């Protein structure tokens, strides 16, 4: 449920205005201009004043009984629905829903163009226009922060860091040895640019290897809460444009992640591995060091990757193997256990 403590409802909105706003919608030829939509709700909870959406076929049954005034459905949807619900066909209902959220709601919290008195900003730092620097933020020498950026309470921006325009850095983030592009979002508690995990063992003693590289983050990247991205030793750690990195992800020194890749929570990528463009790593995936994951490859949740993966391949299991082989192994193992248990009972 959306709380008015945090978000302001901008409704009601005319259904005709919603259709115009979403653009790529196939709607019935005649829609009453006076239909007013007050809110967005899931199918099960929607009232006659609400709009809903169907992006997962698992919930198709609820479309028969929903009370929603309108529902966004897949373009090819031909199933049953409440006759009182106006169906709006979209190529991607979930994407349309995401746009509607911003059409109906605005956050209550605002960020004025201001540097709070408790913030410590070095004289040599450059702060762009219309920036908000929150309480107890520390910005060290020679930092550059682009226009329209937000640095929330308690964050630390180390010497020489460069952050682009329209950044949103949430609370208690620390950033060192990094160059960050435009339109980047970094959620609370993330740590970027710290020393990598590198040691050389000599005569029983683990000697630290200095990491003198940096972290480079491209444009329009989102980094989740409490994620850690280590700087490289000699080679930089690089996150390319459009990447989405979930909470609690560990990215080791010198890792390179290609454009548009998605890394899900609790994944760990060991040093010097390369992830290609538009790859997907499911939750709790482990990638060993010095590997190459090809463009468009996918690793199922909890996959343990110990060797290179070719472009476009889908793997699962630990050690990770082609996904269909993994499914076959799981079925065979289940059958073997069933047979073994039957023999034991006899």
UniProtKB/Swiss-Prot annotation:
| BP-aspect Gene Ontology terms | lipid A biosynthetic process
Q: In which pathway does it act?
A: Bacterial outer membrane biogenesis; LPS lipid A biosynthesis
Q: Name one GO cellular component term.
A: membrane
Q: Which InterPro entries match?
A: Hexapep (IPR001451), Hexapep_transf_CS (IPR018357), LpxD (IPR007691), Trimer_LpxA-like_sf (IPR011004), UDP_GlcNAc_AcTrfase_non-rep (IPR020573)
Q: Does the record bear Acyltransferase in its keywords?
A: yes
Q: Name one Pfam family in it.
A: Hexapep
Name the catalysed reactions: a UDP-3-O-[(3R)-3-hydroxyacyl]-alpha-D-glucosamine + a (3R)-hydroxyacyl-[ACP] = a UDP-2-N,3-O-bis[(3R)-3-hydroxyacyl]-alpha-D-glucosamine + holo-[ACP] + H(+)
GO MF entry, a single one: N-acyltransferase activity
Report the EC number(s), separated by commas if there are several.
Answer: 2.3.1.191
Which keywords are on file for this protein?
Acyltransferase, Lipid A biosynthesis, Lipid biosynthesis, Lipid metabolism, Repeat, Transferase
Entry keyword annotation includes Nucleotide-binding: no
Active site location: 253
Describe the subunit structure.
Answer: Homotrimer.
Function of the protein: Catalyzes the N-acylation of UDP-3-O-acylglucosamine using 3-hydroxyacyl-ACP as the acyl donor. Is involved in the biosynthesis of lipid A, a phosphorylated glycolipid that anchors the lipopolysaccharide to the outer membrane of the cell.
Protein family per UniProt: Belongs to the transferase hexapeptide repeat family. LpxD subfamily.
Designated name of the protein? UDP-3-O-acylglucosamine N-acyltransferase
Q: Which organism is it from?
A: Rickettsia conorii (strain ATCC VR-613 / Malish 7)
Q: Which gene encodes it?
A: lpxD
């Amino acid at each position: 449920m959306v709380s008015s403590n945090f978000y302001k409802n901008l409704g009601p909105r005319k259904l005709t205005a919603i259709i115009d706003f979403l653009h790529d919608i196939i709607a019935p030829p005649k829609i009453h201009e006076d239909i007013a939509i007050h809110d967005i709700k899931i199918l099960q909870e929607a009232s006659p004043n609400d709009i809903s959406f169907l992006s997962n076929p698992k919930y198709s049954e609820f479309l028969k009984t929903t009370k929603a005034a309108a529902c966004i459905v897949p373009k090819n949807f031909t199933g049953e629905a409440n006759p009182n619900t106006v169906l709006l066909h979209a190529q991607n209902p979930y994407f349309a829903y995401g746009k509607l959220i911003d059409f109906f709601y605005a956050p209550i919290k605002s960020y004025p163009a201001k540097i709070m008195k408790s913030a410590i900003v070095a004289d040599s730092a450059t702060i762009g226009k219309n920036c908000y620097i929150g309480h107890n933020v520390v910005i060290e020498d020679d930092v550059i922060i682009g226009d329209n950026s937000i640095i929330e309470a308690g964050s630390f921006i180390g010497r020489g860091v460069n952050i682009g325009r329209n950044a949103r850095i949430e609370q208690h983030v620390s950033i060192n040895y990094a160059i960050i592009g435009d339109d980047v979002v970094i959620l609370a508690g993330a740590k970027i640019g710290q020393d990598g995990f590198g040691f050389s063992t000599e005569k029983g003693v683990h000697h630290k290897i200095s990491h003198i590289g940096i972290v480079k983050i491209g444009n329009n990247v989102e980094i989740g809460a409490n994620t850690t991205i280590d700087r490289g030793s000699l080679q930089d750690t690089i996150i390319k444009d459009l990447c989405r990195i979930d909470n609690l992800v560990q990215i080791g020194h010198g890792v390179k992640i290609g454009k548009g890749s998605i890394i899900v929570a609790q994944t760990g990528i060991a040093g010097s591995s390369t992830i290609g463009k538009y790859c997907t790593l499911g939750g709790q995936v482990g990638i060993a060091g010095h590997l190459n994951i090809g463009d468009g490859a996918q690793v199922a949740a909890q996959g343990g990757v110990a060797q290179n993966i070719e472009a476009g391949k889908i793997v699962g299991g630990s050690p990770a193997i082609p996904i269909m082989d993994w499914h076959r192994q799981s079925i065979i193992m289940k059958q073997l256990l069933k047979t073994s248990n039957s023999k034991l009972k006899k």
